[in-house]
Amino acid sequence: MTEGRSSAAAAASLWERDAEIATVTRTLDALRADQSSAGSLLVFRGEAGLGKTALLTETRRIAERRGCTVWSARGGETLKSVPFNVVRQLLQPALVSLLPEEAREYLGDWYDIAGPALGIVDPGEGSVDPQYVCDGLVAAVRRLARREWPLVLIIDDAHWADQETLRWLAAFAERLDDLSVLVVVARRPGEVSGESARHLEAIAAAAGRPVNNLSALTPEATAGLTRATVGRHADDPFCREVWAVTGGNPYDTVELLAKVLDSEVQPVESRAGELRALNRAARGGGLVDRLNGLGIDATQFAWAAAILGTGISVDLVARLASMSTDVAERCAELLRTARILTEPEPVAGTETEAGELEFVHPLIASAVYNSIPPAVCTAMHGVAAQILTETGHGAAEASRHLLKVHPDDDEELVEQLREAARDHLAVGAPDAARRCLERALEEPPRPEVHAHVLLELGHATLLTAPSVTIEHLQSALAMPGLDGGQRVDAVVRLSQALLHNDQLEEAVRTVEAEAARHGAGPVKLRLQAVQFMWEGIHGETVSQERSRALAELAGTCTGRDNSERALLILRGFDAMTHGENAEEVLQLCDRALVNGRLAPGLGWTDGEWGIELLMMLGSAYAYADRLDRAESLFAEALRAYTGAGWRGGHLSLANAFLGLAYRRQGRLRDAETTLREALSLAERVGRGLPLYWSSTCGLVDTLLARGHVEEAWSIAEQYGFAPPYPSTIVLPDIRSVRGRLLLAVGRTEEGINELEAAEKRGGGRARGKPGKPGGGGGGFARVPAGPVPPRPGIPRPCSSRRLPLS
């Protein structure tokens, strides 16, 4: 009976789907025709029960019949918080067939980045940039897809896919032009919001064709299905009522007709009035009543299965529901007969454990889960987390259950969630880490631990959401718990977040206030160095008094520790921006190095000082004409961030400043390539931030130097390279580059105004020795405009004019 109904359900869901099946068939034929052809993306959208899964099953059947390899995965309503869950499902056939050394060979340089997210490599310590992991997954799947041509990727219930998978899928969908693969996605309309919704919109846009919206069955199709199921003698009024009751929903229609058969209702007009009651019993509250009618044991078995969501087995459910194996086996059979649970269909290339079960339809799974009393639900999630932990699974795997447990001042749960957050960060899932730490705060943590959880929450969001980081770190510093070095680290990290959020004045005040709390010593010296560092890149706070104070403090430093080395770098940068002797600038910078290299603890990925100090060091070398050392520093930054998996703002700035070094060397083609990469990365982090301005300004400047005026103007228009400008120093100077651009396109008066504003702004800096190689009007500012071909009506800028770019 169950098998027959499953076949009927599948057949019903394909009624009136000829157009969709024809689209699938044509696309598959195109895929198989040419391995060099572009890839395709099909998106099917429809309400629950309209036959999306049946259509994807038919897609699999057609594809396999044509000799295609098919990988498939499915989102789950209770699994949305599990990072990379769906993409791991999707790639399981490929991953289980590869030995570790084969996987490393196929994934190449991306093995250590994508491997932890896919669960085939143990993650390292610390945080990994989620964008880099996403890029690694895109590269990994592209390599695997080329090996398996012709390949079809099927993702069902994408509205319930985890955010990390959706981010990968959106990025992957944008790169199908040179990859012969078919991607088929099915989802419900609505159901999601925030980042997940934006990713789904991007996926639909990447399809390059209208989304296939599935419609309900017409009255004629419903009548045909009714007669095919209950007999040709079903009369027209009865068939019409079936359609009216179900709205033409294929799933509801099949379930209702199954009830008609079970109840032995004759399909005639006189019995049509009974259909609405039968339909209510098939789903929602009626389904719950039907479940309760099977007995308390069967009900608890179904509840436990709904809590698990995936990997449902009789043994595991028995343990979760606290029942014997014999009772659990009997309950499983009852639920199979009642069409609540079923055995999953075997899929080529995947491993299915003996006795594994799944819900017949997601609607049933949702109804069962939502029927669990809240107190019972949270308790069962707690038991499920405990079972996973006891069976050797990590805190990250148990965290989806821990998130559902009712807050109860549980110190152990707080520690488990903190551990899960660390695991999530290590695979590039900061949003999952954030959810764990936010839930830990609700427990709540002990007073002496609370600030530490907030600090960890601030670290979890630093690379992706500076504004959120600021809120958490300010809260952590406002309560007891952070002492000594931890508090200083938190203050410095907060000031970095404020800087990246374009709140530089507040960043300076934050460090200044903390420095006032300490007496003379290494801690105070470090905070003073950080304060000078932020002031040094804040164009509005530069003054002669500040420079004198910095010179006096740096004059006492010999480079004995990193605080002294930082002050030497800051003094060298300040001297360069004020046009002091270039040789003195270089001597200061060289004294900050150890045997010509960055000191331990001052590396590009070391967290104590951050990226800004080393960018100042490299800039000082660049504008003091030690271009070899500047290039070496920025190239080292690129390698360090790439190796560490930091593909956000850090890598963008590394590219931007390496582009600056190339620009100063006259390697304009290399500069343009590097700066375009910097801008692409910066846009992912967010427009308007200082790193975004650095990339845009550098690229416009380089295009002008290459004589590509129209392209420079196009970039400026596209990326908002116009006032209002940020308060931070940007290299090269924004106003100077903008002024040259305006002159180049013939907007002479506006260009002159910008250049005069740049000169006025730079006047306070460019004092002292303007003729020296590092002078404010020279070394720091002397970036020749480059050859710009004369154009009618556009005055040619004077390439010999020295402009203040600081």
Protein language model regions, located:
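Conserved Walker-type P-loop NTP-binding/catalytic site
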Residues: 2-3, 85-152, 201, 223, ...
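Conserved adenine-nucleotide phosphate-binding loops and their immediately adjacent elements
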Residues: 1-27, 112-125, 273-283
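Sensor-1/coupling segment of RecA-like P-loop NTPase cores
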Residues: 168-207, 211-213
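Short secondary-structure boundary elements
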Residues: 50, 221-229, 233-435, 439-442
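P-loop NTPase Walker A phosphate-binding motif
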Residues: 47-81, 85-88
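Helix-coil-helix junctions within alpha-helical repeat/solenoid scaffolds
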Residues: 337, 431, 465, 507, ...
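Internal alpha-solenoid helical repeat scaffolds
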Residues: 64-66, 204, 243, 258-261, ...
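Hydrophobic anchor at the beta1->P-loop junction of P-loop NTPases
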Residues: 44
